A protein has these predicted regions:
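STAS-typified acidic loop motif
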Residues: 8-20
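Conserved polar catalytic motif of the HATPase_c/GHKL fold
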Residues: 48-52
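Conserved beta-strand-loop-beta-strand hairpin that lines the nucleotide-binding pocket
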Residues: 1-8, 53-147
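Short, charged, low-hydrophobicity "junction" segments
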Residues: 20-23, 69
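A short, mixed-charge helix-start or loop-turn motif at secondary-structure junctions
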Residues: 6-10, 32-35
């Protein structure tokens, strides 16, 4: 079955926009009638992805971040896209506690949190070409599965 609804949002990569973006994504997912816990999980994962883009992708240079969201039946999909410096070693970057900015007191837990709160997380990136974090979460139970 195809996508039943989509939303895209583009904004400046500024820390003051992180809260706006996570609330916009939360508002979009409400059409699936998620639990408060599911909404909190999504907001946390999106927040981590946006923060990674701002700090690591752009190093606080306020270029654009795009978020694409979609719902299909009871599944929620969100992509957080930046056009920053990219990730040279995705596997290493996704290791818990790995950080490229230890002097900034970064814990290196962003991807670990995304993986903990979402059902699937996949990262696409090339150095100097940006990064796409694809995330998916199943919301509740698909009542159509029993028909």
């Amino acid at each position: 079955m195809g996508i039943t609804n989509e939303m895209s949002l583009e904004f400046d990569a500024r820390t003051c926009n992180e809260g706006f973006a996570r609330v916009a994504v939360a508002a979009f997912v409400t059409q699936l009638n998620p639990t408060l816990e599911e909404v909190a999980d999504i907001k946390t994962a999106v927040s981590e992805a946006i923060t990674n883009s701002i700090i690591h992708g752009y190093e606080y240079d306020a270029k654009k971040i795009r978020i694409d969201c979609a719902v299909r039946q009871r599944e929620f999909f969100v992509d957080v896209i930046d056009y920053g410096k990219g990730i040279a070693d995705i596997e290493k970057a996704m290791e818990p506690m790995f950080t490229t900015k230890p002097e900034k007191d970064r814990a290196g837990m962003g991807f670990a949190f995304m993986e903990a709160f979402m059902d699937e997380v996949e990262v696409e990136s090339e150095p100097d070409k940006g990064c796409i974090v694809h995330m998916k979460k199943k919301i509740g139970i698909d009542i159509n599965q029993y028909e």
